[in-house]
Amino acid sequence: MIVKEERAEMDATSKDAPKRLKLTMEFAGGHLTRAEQHTGRGDYEAASAEVGMYHALIENALEFLSTFKRDSNKTRDLYKRLEMALRADGPRLTAMRRITPLEFAVWIKQVEDFARDGRTEALNSFYGHTVVHDPEKVEKPIPTPTPKSNNQP
C-alpha cells in the first residue's frame, strides 16, 4: 500500500524517470527507517505496516522500470541506482528480522527475500545481455542391463 501523498508526488514526477526513482527510493528508505524505530521500541505491528509500505514502493519501482527499453544506458543507470539502494537495505531488514518475534519476523523475511529478488532482477537487467549462460545439461537415461537366461550352456 502506497500512501496517497507519496503516490501523488511520484505521479507528478513520472515524466522524469531518474527523479521519480530517486523519490521512490527516498520514500522507501524513510519507511524502512521508521520500521527500524518501531522495532527498537517493540511496536511490531507498526513496524510491519512500515515494512509493507517499503515493499509496495520497491514493487512499484520495479514495475516502473520494467516499462523502459532494457538496452538503453539510461535504463541500466536506473537499475543500478535501484540495485545499490536494495543492497544497502538488505542488512537493515536482516537486523530487524533477527530482533523481531517470529509471528512478525515471517513478514520481514518475505520482504527481505523480495528485496533480494528485486536486486537480482536489477542486476540481471544491467548485465543480462552480456552474460553467456551455460547450456542446460540433458541427463542421459541409465541403460539397464538385460538379464541373461539360464538356458545357455
Language-model regions, residue ranges each:
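Long, charged/polar, soluble alpha-helical segments
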Residues: 1-153
